[in-house]
Amino acid sequence: MKKSIPFLLLATLQLSCGSSQEKPEVMQTEEKTIELAPKEILAEAYQLFKEGNDNESVVLAEKVLAIGKETKNDTLIGRALTSLCRNAQRNLDTNRLAELSEGLKLLSETSGNKKWMMYRAHQNAEMWRLVGNLERAEKFYIESMELSSEIGSKGMFMIDHFNKSFVSTAKGDFEEAERLISKYYVLRRELDSTSEDAYGLIALCYLLEQQKNYKGAHEVATVTRRLFKVQNLFPEPPDEKPLLEVEAKVKEELEASLFEEIAKNSTSKS
């Protein structure tokens, strides 16, 4: 398995540079009847969340939730609940997540729309991965992927290959982790053959670090940080946590001179 890592490293680095690219959007197929203002409010709430401003993000999401309930707009209610689920990640508020999850479950039951159960599963998987409960996270990722495959949500199906790879890596199943990362890039090209992605590199550097390939992990982590800075992207909590762990570990394991040399060389790599 180790022999295939350089190829995966090269392929992912080549696919990861270029124009600005957010973490793949997984809510692209909403109803066209959503009012423009609430959509813009939710977009701002998401941006504030990524920047770490959860208080203001929550205020905006709660505003949209109120609008959704008042107008009986299932899409606004579901998207607002999903946004609030993300906000619960920062403080690992699993009680709040459970409350919001019930809201998504009820919405799915009353509307007959399984996508809200898909978002519920995805948000629970993200939280439990962040908490460190790998078995629970994996269970929810599997549920999310089954639902996204069933209802044809290609964006969610793609991104959960990326997400689930962290669980496989942490459990020591490197072969499965590499399969998931490779599949993520295949699915990404199928959705948009022209887009470039920096996000997938987080999964790769975490895999390399867990395999004790500290040089490779440091190189990929450095490129990842540079691309995020250039593209003005903000990793979400479940994804930044392993990146921070990699950065701390490689600094601990590599000699200072080698650490600096790799960092210097990687600043111009793509």
Predicted segment positions?
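Amphipathic alpha-helical segments of tetratricopeptide repeats
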Residues: E62-A66, E102-E109, I142-S153, S182-E190, ...
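C-terminal motif of bacterial Sec signal peptides marking the signal peptidase cleavage site
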Residues: L15-S16
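Structural signature of alpha-solenoid helical repeat scaffolds
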Residues: K32, K72, G112, G152, ...
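C-terminal non-catalytic interaction modules
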Residues: Q21-L36, H218-S270
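Tandem amphipathic alpha-helical repeat scaffolds
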Residues: P38-G52, G78-L92, W116-G132, I159-A170, ...
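Residue signature of alpha-solenoid helical repeat architecture, marking inter-repeat boundaries
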Residues: E35-L36, T75, K115, G155, ...
